[in-house]
Structures are given as structure tokens and as C-alpha cells.
Amino acid sequence: MVFADRADAGRRLADQLVRFRDVPDVLVVGLPRGGVPVARQVAEALHAPLDVMLVRKLGVPGQRELAMGAIGEGGVRILNDDIVAYHQVSVDEIEQVAAQESAELRRRAAQFRGDRGPVELAGKIVVVVDDGLATGATARAACQAARQRGAAHVVLAVPVAPHDWVQRMGTSADEYVCVGAPRQFFAVGNFYDDFAQTSDAEVVECLRSSAGPPAPATAARRVRVRGVVQGVGFRPFVHALASSLGLVGSVGNDDEGVIIDAEGPPASLDEFARRLRDEAPPLASVTAVEVCPVVSTGARTFTIAASAAGDGPPAGGAAALPPDTAVCADCVREMFDPADRRYRHPFITCTNCGPRFTIAVGVPYDRVNTTMAAFELCPACAAEYHDPDNRRFHAQPVSCHDCGPTLELVTADGAVTARGDEAVRACQQLLDHGAIVAVKGIGGYHLMCDARNDDAVTLLRLRKRRGDKPLAVMVADLGVLDGVAEPNGAERGALLARQRPIVLLRRVDRSGRADSPIWPESVAGRASEVGVMLPYAPVHLLLFDGLGTDVLVCTSGNVADEPIVVDDTDALSRLGTLADAWLRHDRPIHRPCDDSVIRVVTETPGDGVMPVRRSRGWVPLPVDIGTWPGQELPGVLALGGDLKNVVCVTAGRQAWLSQHLGDLGELSSYQAAQAAVQQLLALTRVRPSVVAIDAHPGYLSGRLGRQVAAAMGVPVIAVQHHHAHVVSALAEWRLLDSIDDDHPVIGVAFDGTGYGPDGSIWGGEVLLVGPQRARRVGHLAAVPLPGGDAAIEHPSRAALSHLWAAGCAWDPRLACVAATSEHELATLRTQFERSVATVPTSSMGRLFDAVAALAGVRQAVDYEAQAAIELQAAADGGERGSYRFPGADRDGAIDAAPVIRAVVDDVLAGTPCGVVSTRFHRAVAEMVRVEAARAAAMVATPTVVLSGGVFQNATLATMCTELLLADGFDVRVHRMVPTNDGGLALGQAVVAGALFAAGGEMGKD
């Protein structure tokens, strides 16, 4: 197969594209220079317009032929993050290269087009043409640039390419067309008799002489918009945009998102499609704009049509519900304006704020499908709802004092003592006098009290069985934090974001100062951080207006480890021993949704957000997980673990994680998980092909998964705990298509408990991880752990276990020994000697507990990871010393005994706890560095993933990341889902989906 020249190649290529001849909205673009003469022949044969696609490679400084990305017209920029990180290209260097290539882009654009601008791509079928494909780097960038400029469908067409070119290009284009793809391929020019270089003048002539057919005066198009486009004011936005452009037609919601029929001049329709994405409302997230020509309906105006609901799974995926968001500034301004009819209305909302996920009972998102359906609009609200010029045009939860809902204050006997604004005033008086009030918000009830009233805080801890566990606070404004915490710019941004999460802020050390506030100590105890959030519901702002305090304890309305209470009757019974009064309203909460918790960490890769609990403000937004090599994953339901339970549904590129559900050991949490499974399946319309569970045979989540799978008639796949942890991070970074089981990444999974295939408890693991398999190549040497849960609740037991394994005497001068009775010591000694009632564990979490107990930090805990949290808080930032782990033995076991012996020596020598803590943290980080290097020698990979609950420790995560980056590794930590068990279900779903898609039996339950 040899072409005479580029014109001959273009004509033969056009024969492969005849189905696009005379099709509206087809545009041909050639890649300068050599691709343009080929594209000219294609454009003329298809009767389509011709333009150039200007793309410039961004070369690595000093290695210009190595592409670290590309730029295109319209501000399109594509970066290969892996190349940038591996070659340590700085932001300044990227900008310098981009500036040089941008200048060349402008020069070429002016030379090729003259006074004409680029042809609009939005909504078009774009055929990208080159004279051949070798590496595909430029073609790939051109396709991505076309997508970013709004192309509805991208076709990559070349005369000749290597035989495996479609696999190389992956998902860059929607279609691939080629005249020939020989196995013996050396260079494009080998397939042309005449392959003379194309000049700039020839490109200009091709563009000048290749004019497409005259555009019709009007056209009709159907536009499908996908993403978070319901409940965010998208239909009013579309109505306003279409009207401003003189278009006619309609817009409506359906099961898949928003559907638009629009008619008007083609240029206006092009602009309309582009602006749908570029100017979407603030709460919207547009993932796709799909355009196709249709027959005119003869519409004369542009209207909002009634929503359409279908049966069964939508072909293109279910519409995405938006999460609940904080009240916006416009609504706050109205709420405190005495002249406004919504003055002090506790349920004020608009298209840009308020509850969504928690009040929606189904899709499409319309008032009739929300818990606001029971509240009939008053004439004034109805007029606003139907007025295109009003900011509450089609705002589904709109309400006022006349239409409801209504606040009321209730006492323990169920008596209503005040309503409306009087209920707010009465609640303020109770809080000012030290009472604990259960306040119903957006996602459930909170228990609130004055954080500056130490007696009230102590009483709340006692009633809630909270022990020393830190309590979150809600502050009236950021000024309240003066002298308590000094949030940086990123932390302030997180506090003020529309999600309004609880942000963990490092406390300022003001010990011993007379002006030191007392409340941080009472709410946070010995933790180094305090959890802070700002008011996000209108009722919160009303409570602070006139309240005697500017900081309230704001903790979930539940008993420890149970889900947050949402039902009013349940609130009186389940919170009856906790609260003195209830400030509630009559708007039902369909789905419970606890507050999200995040930490901002700027020293590690990513945008700095480390999710600790992903719930209100983020749920139910899907996580884009990309594709697994060569295909999309099947529908999977994953049940997560028993602690911090979250369930997950995946289909294609998307994963939907539920809100935080609690610990399944509590019956109410187990029931909440059952409900969440059904709600998530109904919301996403996914019909799972397989159910994923944790490999632990005794987990309640596994039992639930088996029950659901049996009811659906689908198989169950059990996934090893730490494999799931690492893969969850790979999924959120969309790295699944860059690895396989023969080319794994290095996964470091540190946590407290995870069931190992050998029946022991794992938790200090170094793994080689692919989508289907994880190979254990390193781990802490196992030590015997006595007593199951008792060892978790008493770090002293972990310390005694590690002392025994290290051959250290149980010296009574050690705090862990002194805290244990002689009888218990004798019992434990017998258990160790006879290997009775102990389980071997390689848990890093238990090693942290052991060191905390040895250092005298904590011998018993009131909440999970308390000892490790306080050990981290005690760390001395000025200490530069370190303990040292030995290298792994031939089986990959890493003995902690030398570290334990060094800790004992330091403690008995009177070394301060902070020094011991820092030396231990540094030892663990150095061990991770050494093990990563050892694992990298087994497989050629630069990627290390850090996952598991231990990496919530920001000190350790930062130390590990810095050491690994210095060694040239590409380090990935969690940024979208929690590193703890709250992210486990995502990893389970991906592993099970990969196994199921491959027909594998591995891990089947």
C-alpha cells in the first residue's frame, strides 16, 4: 500500500468516511502542515468546512523531543503529570515553555488564517486528519484539544498507521478510521511516492480554496447535557441563555440529565452549545454536551418543559443529584434584611444553595420528587418560581414564612413551647444557660451547647459517652479562632467553601498564657487539632444572631458509633437522655448525611485536601475513576468494611459513594447501610453484575453483601482489605488504565486491622498492586496480640506484646507495665508462652499504640486511634534523630524489635515523650523509603501509593512523601476519598469489577 502523494491519500481516506458526506455539523480539521492537503481532499468529498487544528508540543526543558504536554488554541493546555513529576519540571519552567510555544501558535494562526478566526467546534462532529500516525502524540493532543473546545464527537482519520494504533490511542477519539495499518511500520514517509514537505503557503492555499457549502439560515438541534445539572438552576440558565441568543425550543429534566431542543441560526446554536459548558451555574458540573441535528418542531418561543421519567436504567447513565450546599451570600443578605419578605426565614434558599441530596426522593429533580412536595407554594413564591427574571425561577425548594416549613422548640415530654422565630429566641436562652439542645439541620440532628461553658461540654461528653474524643465546633466567624488556631489561606478557603466541612486545624500552643482560651482544651483534649466549621444552614446563622457565645459545640445527634438521627420521633427517643430540648422543623430528611471532615495538607501532592470523612457537601457527586485497561468496568456494588462504613456503586467511569454510615456493630448503623444500598441503587439506576465485600469472614458488611447478592442473583467477590485500600487511591487518581497485573504499582498500606489471606491480622504492608492481584513483598514481622478488641482499647497490651516479641523485660518503670495488674500480667505471660488466645498481627496501627503506651502517652483509649493521635500531637518538631528498622528478611518481614528496644532505652533514660515520638515517626518514614526502593527493584515502576488509616497522620504522610519524592518516586496519596475505611468500598468495587470483567475466579466468596 503506497500513496502517490498526500492528495491521493486524502481521496482514498475520504472513501472510508462517506457516511459523513452532507451530514450537518461535520467539520474537517487538518494538522499542519502535512495533514492539511490530506484534510482538503476529505473536506471536499464530504462537502464539509475545512480548518486547521493548531497544536504545539510542550517539550521537557533540555529534552525538547520528550513531550510533557501540549497546548492548543483557545487556551487549551494538556499536561502529562507523570512526566512533569518524574523530570521535576517546575511551574516556572512549564510557563516559560508554554509562552514560547504560544507565540508560535499565534504566528501560525495569523499566517494560515489571516483575518479569520478558528471555526467553532462546540457541538460539531470533528474529523481530525493527519498524513499518517507514528507515535500519535500530536494526534492525541489534537483530539483532546477538540474535546476541550466542545466537540460532540471526535473522529481521528489517517491514511496509514501502525497495526496497533487504535490500542495506542485508547480513548483519545470516539472513532478511528485508517486506509491501512501494516505490521511492518517504520516511518510515515515510506508509504508515499511523493512525501515532499508541505509549505506554509500550501496550507494557506488549501484553507482559502476549500470553502464548505453555504450554511442554512436556521437549524434544529437536540442537546443532551450530562453531569450535575439538576437542582442547580440549570434549566433557568438554559432558558435565559437561549432567549438571549434568539433561539426557540424547550429545556427539560429527564432520567439522564437535561435535554434541550433548540432552533435558530447555526452560529447562534454553536455559541449556545459552547456557553452551556463555559457559563454553567456555580453548583453545576457539566461532564458532557452532546449535540445532534433534528427536524424542526416549529416552536415559536423557548419554554421549560415538564420533566420526563423513564423506566429502567437510563441508556446514558442516571442524572447526577447535587450535594447539599451552604446558604449563599444573596440569601443571607435577604434573611437579615427587615424589608425583605423572607426576613429571618430559617429555610431560605435559591437555585444556588440549600439542601438537595437530603431532600430528594428521586429523579428527575423536581419539587414533586423532594420532601418539599408537601408544602404548597403560596401565590408570592409561585410567582417567583414562574418568573424567568427572578433568581428563584424554577428553584425547587423555594419557600417563605407563609408556605412553610416551620421551626418549633420541643421539650423532653414532646410539648411544643415555641414556634418560628420565637423558637430560635427560646433556643438561644437555653444555650446561654448551659443547656444541650438537639438542633435539626440539613442532614440530621446536631447536639449543641456553649463551647465556652465547661460544665455544659463536660455534661455533653458524659451523656454521649464521648470520653476524651474531640468534639467539633461551629464558630460564628473566623475571628473566633484568634488565639486558638491560625488557618492558612488554603484552610480559610476550605472553611468558606460551599461544602462547609469540618476542617481540622492545628491548635496554637498558648499553654501557660493568661489570655489562652479555655474552650479548645475542653472540646479537643490533648489532640493537636481542633475540628472547626462555619454555619451552613440558615437556622445556624439565626442561632448565632443574638446568642451569648460565638462558638458552639456541634456534634452529630447520635449515641457513639450510631448513625445521625433524622426522624423527629427517633430524635425524642434516641436523644432523650442526651438533650434538654429539641429545635426541629417539619421538612422531612429523606437521607441522613453527616458533616464531612477534611484536613488541608499542603506539603503532599494534590490540591491539599485530605478527606477524613466524605459526606455532606460531596455526596452524591460521583468520582471519575477513568477506565480499566481497554474497557469500562461493569456495574458493581461494594459494601466496604465494618468501621466507618460507606457503600459504593460503580458503572463505567463513575463511582458513587454513599454518605458516612457509622460502625456496623450498632444495629441502627447496619440498618442505615441496608437503606443506603437500596437508595444508592435507585439513585444511580445501576443494576450490579457483581457484589464486592471485604475478605474478612466475620464482617457484618460481608453478611449484608451476601444477602443483597442472593436477592439480585449475582456473584460475590471477596477483596483483600489492603488491596482495596491501595486500589481506591489508584481509582481516584484515574491510574487504572496505566497499570496491569504485570506492571503493578507499589502500595504501602498501613492501618489497624485487615484480614490477611493467611488468617492473621495484617496492617503494615508493602504490596505490588494491580487491578486484579496484590503481591505482598514486605510487612512488619507479626507479633502475638492478646484479647481481640481488648488490645485495641488498651494500647498497653500492644506494648506488652511488642516487648515480649522483642525479648524485652516487662520493667515496672515502663508506664504500660505499671498500668497493668499483676494478675493480668501473669495471664498475658501465659497466653504468650502457650500461644493461647492470641492472634498474630503485622499491624502498623498497633505498633503506634505500643510506642504511645511505652512513651507514657496513653494506656487505654476512649476512641479509635486516640493513642496514635496523641503520640503525633506530642512530636517535637525540632528533633532530628531517628530510630532504625532493619531491612526485610528473605520473606519480606521487617522486625520492629530494634525500634522497640531503642524506645525502651530512651524512655528509661528519661528522654522526653516528644523526642521519642519524632524519632519513631522518622523511623517509620525511613522504613517506607527503604521498602519502596526494594520493591522498585522487583518491578519497573516509579509510582508509590500510600493508603490506610495510619496515613491520616499528617506528620507521617508528609515525612514519607518528602523522602519518596527525593528518591524520584511518583507519590500518590488520597485527595478525593478517605485513606481510612471510608474509601475502602471504592477499591473493592474496582478490584471486583476487574476480576469479573476478566472472568477471573480469584477472590470469589
Model-predicted regions and their roles:
Residues P397, G404-T406, G641-Q671, A675-A676, ...:
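A contiguous, well-structured pocket-lining segment that forms one wall/lid of small-molecule binding clefts
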Residues M1-T218:
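PRPP-associated nucleotide enzymes
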Residues F186, H722-L735, V745-F750, Y755-G756, ...:
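Glycine-rich phosphate-binding/hydrolytic loop that grips phosphoryl groups
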Residues P214-E408:
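Intrinsically disordered, low-complexity, mixed-charge
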Residues E101, H401, R465, K469-V553:
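Ligand-binding beta-strand-loop-alpha-helix segment within the catalytic cores
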Residues H47-N80, P293, I436, G444-D509:
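A phosphate-binding glycine/aspartate-rich beta-alpha loop in the early core of alpha/beta enzymes
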Residues E279, V368, E384, L547-P629, ...:
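Internal gly/pro-rich beta-alpha loop/helix module
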Residues D51, A157-P159, E175-F186, D694, ...:
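Conserved phosphate-binding/catalytic loops in two-lobed NTP-binding clefts
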